[in-house]
Amino acid sequence: MSQGVTAPFARHAMAYVLAGGRGSRLMELTDWRAKPAVYFGGKSRIIDFALSNALNSGIRRIAVATQYKAHSLIRHLQRGWNFFRPERNESFDILPASQRVSEEMWYRGTADAVFQNIDIIESYDPKFIVLLAGDHVYKMDYEKMLQQHVEQGADVTVGCLEVPRAEATAFGVMHTDTTDRIISFLEKPADPPAMPGKADKSLVSMGIYVFETKFLLDELRRDAADPNSSHDFGKDIIPYIVKHGKAVAHHFDKSCRRSSSEAVSYWRDVGTVDAYWAANIDLTDIVPELDLYDREWPIWTYGEITPPAKFVHDKEGRRGEAVSSLVSGGCIISGASLRHSLLFTGVRVHSFSHVENTVVLPYADIGRSCRLKNVVIDAEVKLPAGLVVGEDPEFDAKRFRRTENGICLITRAMIEKLDA
């Protein structure tokens, strides 16, 4: 929270986090939880990154709009983000979809998820709204984006970054002039336009927007009254402002929080099983691109009380050990070996098992003599002794969710089918 006193714009801002999406490309990982509630990095949830960025930037009013399978997300927020104090002009509101506009409709789109809570926003009377997606992994100082918004007199400032053109179909794609004013904006185009001079790159929206509050609320009311609108920021609100107002692009490089000047700008969508696996496994690198050890920019989360990780047995073939791995509190590695793997809280790995390039979510239990490679194991899954995954693609695909890149997702329901 190093920015708290020195962030003149963030002190007058409210962060509004959109956290209602399912994230269907994560397959069974989001059968029972929203994408922002998916575990990441050993002890966090994906939403903790947007929330921590807001807190570390100096923002002290935060609202989170939830909808799909919200129970685990709400429980996490109540446990881990309950330290805001009204007497210090701080607030943290959880806003489930509650059919405030019509008894027949939940949130109809991202813009509607804000419109339905206009009264709550007005009650706090913030000067700025920082609108955030709750399902991306990155570290960013929103104060710098707010500063650009004010200096350029923008109606909306849109966070953006360069991505390979082939990947841009999943994002809003923009063109800018030499002053960073957005002159065109296409939401998820089938054929994304390239950046001038960079035929293989597109400039895309990060789903991060800064508005002055009055302007935003006026736009939301206008959009809500339009029967032809889908009530979505990327499809409706932003293109309208690009055409009729002043929309400005804020390049992520300008506000990315890095641990050194040589570090790259790190932002991940983690919207597929492959991307989710890769982003977690990347953390086992000697110097990962995402620095979770930056004490000046911590990733806040709910800290479950657990004993330290434990490694037991020291015999040839039955040695509890881990190489290039992250092992969280409460884990017990009993005569098993780990390589390039990430274990969340309370995982148990039994003797003679070998685990490589694998992400294991909380309280999973890996039985004796298992061999696992390139796997994601969902929370509380109990693997039977002798299970082998990652060596026979056809056999894996019959039993588990196997991606095109060869990553296997294992859930409790899949294991129960093996026993049936």
UniProtKB/Swiss-Prot annotation:
Q: In which pathway does it act?
A: Glycan biosynthesis; glycogen biosynthesis
Residue positions binding alpha-D-glucose 1-phosphate: 107, 172, 187-188, 205
Please give the superkingdom of this protein's source: Bacteria
- The answer to whether the entry has keyword ATP-binding is yes
GO-annotated biological processes = glycogen biosynthetic process
User: What is the organism field in this record?
Assistant: Rhodopseudomonas palustris (strain ATCC BAA-98 / CGA009)
**Keyword annotations for this protein?**
ATP-binding, Carbohydrate metabolism, Glycogen biosynthesis, Glycogen metabolism, Nucleotide-binding, Nucleotidyltransferase, Transferase
Please give the subunit comment from the record: Homotetramer.
The name this protein goes by in its record:
Glucose-1-phosphate adenylyltransferase
State the Gene Ontology terms under molecular function: ATP binding; glucose-1-phosphate adenylyltransferase activity
Give the SUPFAM superfamilies listed for this entry.
Nucleotide-diphospho-sugar transferases, Trimeric LpxA-like enzymes
What does the UniProt record say this protein does?
Involved in the biosynthesis of ADP-glucose, a building block required for the elongation reactions to produce glycogen. Catalyzes the reaction between ATP and alpha-D-glucose 1-phosphate (G1P) to produce pyrophosphate and ADP-Glc.
What Enzyme Commission number(s) does the record list for this chain? 2.7.7.27
What catalytic reaction does the record list?
alpha-D-glucose 1-phosphate + ATP + H(+) = ADP-alpha-D-glucose + diphosphate
User: What family does the entry list?
Assistant: Belongs to the bacterial/plant glucose-1-phosphate adenylyltransferase family.
Q: Which Pfam families match?
A: Hexapep_GlmU, NTP_transferase
